[in-house]
Amino acid sequence: VLLFRPLPKHLDQAVIENALAPEKDVDCMTDLSMSGVFTGKKIGFPPCTPQACMEILDHYGIDCTGKKAVVIGRSLVVGKPAAMMLVKKNATVTICHTRTVNMPSVAREADIIIVAAGRAGVVGAEYVKEGQTIIDVGINVNAEGKLCGDVDYAAVEPIVDAITPVPGGVGSVTTSVLVGHVVEAAMRKVNA
């Protein structure tokens, strides 16, 4: 089951989300499924977008062990789960948000940056240095009506070692992860 949000105002989102059985919660919307991300227990499924970020790192052979990672964004949809998944991969993680003091210098210290800020082009060249891997989760529409990420791709791409594009980056992998979760949920039901 995939619940599209926001729900109409007369519905209680928390009640509806938590009515889902974890085995059908393919995008980690219930509190119980989310607890699995934070405890390391296999309850339900992890959220698709943070898992997509981890799969991108795995696909390109980026070992997180001992690396400094910065997650820009602290939502329960991407930021916090991504941070926990990076910790599970033995990275040292800092979560940045709107109240982080001197965020560009914090980000420059990282080896890996996951950006889920929710604002177009918020991360520019002053946030990065050579050798970094940048995963841009953002999906925005710029003034020209084109899709763009939370990272100023044109300014950042020449500096860093690797960066995901928007469109065609994390979103595509997220869709693949979601399909995988749906298939796995069906297989679990059939084999139960």
Language model features by range: what are they?
Residues D12-F38, G131, I135-N191:
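Rossmann-fold NAD(P)-binding glycine/threonine-rich loop
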Residues L2-C64:
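Anion-binding alpha/beta catalytic cores of soluble intermediary-metabolism enzymes, centered on
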Residues R5, A117, V137-G138:
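Glycine-rich, N-terminal phosphate-binding loop of Rossmann-like dinucleotide-binding domains
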Residues S35, K41-T133, N142, K146-E157:
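Glycine-rich phosphate/diphosphate-binding loop of Rossmann-like nucleotide-binding domains
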